[in-house]
Regions:
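Hydrophobic structural segments
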Residues: 1-161
């Protein structure tokens, strides 16, 4: 499952292709929706690869950070070789950590591909699962479920999200 998004940010009519967004801006927005503090203790969420100061004009959304996704990110939104600026995945690339990331390793290949093309990689996993209007809510909505409650209340809002 994947989709793409183009961020135009606040632009003028004369400047429609320039982005006013940065990787850091996207990270801050994701933090408001899916706070890292709400992730499970074993989870690894946040910026994996990239520079928070880099501009963002397009984002590739995907479930997993695989080699195929990295190659699609390099190919870009129109496949013309103008890469996406950022990839946001649900599942983390380095859940258990890594001591070495050679290009011959699947995860090392993903990291190398993204770094060579200056593409940021960010993920939101269990923090997106538990968020109000997050992954679980979206799935419940698609399935038509009503009167849902969290399995493990974790928040302080009225619905304990």
């Amino acid at each position: 499952m994947q989709s793409s998004s183009h961020l135009n940010g606040p632009t003028t009519a004369a400047d429609t292709s320039a982005s006013k967004w940065t990787v850091g801006d996207v990270m801050a927005l994701m933090e408001t929706w899916y706070p890292a503090a709400t992730a499970q203790s074993w989870d690894r969420v946040g910026l994996i690869v990239g520079d928070p100061a880099s501009p963002v004009r397009s984002i590739l959304l995907a479930l997993d950070p695989t080699a195929a996704i990295a190659q699609q990110a390099v190919a870009g939104p129109s496949g013309d070789g103008q890469p996406y600026d950022m990839v946001i995945t649900h599942h983390p690339l380095l859940l258990r950590g890594a001591s070495f990331l050679p290009v011959t390793d699947p995860k090392g290949g993903v990291v190398t591909t993204l770094i060579r093309s200056d593409i940021a990689l960010f993920n939101a996993h269990t923090n997106a699962d538990v968020a109000c209007d997050g992954v679980a809510t979206a799935l419940a909505d698609v399935l038509g479920l009503r009167d849902t409650v969290p399995l493990e209340p974790c928040g302080t809002d009225a619905e304990r999200h």
